[in-house]
Amino acid sequence: ERAREMGYRESSCLRGGLADWLEAGYIAVDGTSCMTKSYAEYLEQEMKTPSLTPDEIRQRIAQGEKVALLDIRVPEEYASMAIPEGISAPGCESAYRFLDLVPSPDTLVITNCGSRTRGILCAQMLIDLGVPNPVASMRGGTLNWKLSGYDLEFNRTDRTAPPSFQALAFAREHANMLAQKHDISFVDAAELQAWQG
């Protein structure tokens, strides 16, 4: 009932709860960031989010293919260790910096994080936004890059410049199209404050 009050159109309750779920032989996931990790795995399977291994990415770069490696980790993680060709584009910032970071629609965009979760989420976000480029996540992220025998750079000091007006306009246009497609409405700051009491 509470979910419906919050505006959810469809909601249901699992009869018997978690105990019956486990008794039926299904698994429950717990641990650090388990909801996010589970959601990313589900999203990748349901949406068929493309992914490439470090070897496949390295091969494409060696063949001269245009590739943009968007490292979507927070700046501190990027600074500590990053793929040499990586570009810092933290999380959702990759959307509103996209046009500045990837000016050619022919460029293959690869999103990577430390392991894979945020890379999957960001790749699917860019796909859903309708960017003109092919997009994939890196399987296993930065750690898998290293385990595959490729170098990392440490103590990176490069920073991504603030987004241009054109990049922000591009992101806004694509976000509005996505919201319209899924019938998502917006609230302003005053309405949000009213909800918060």
Predicted regions and their residues:
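Cytosolic catalytic domains that perform sulfur/thiol-centered chemistry
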Residues: 1-197
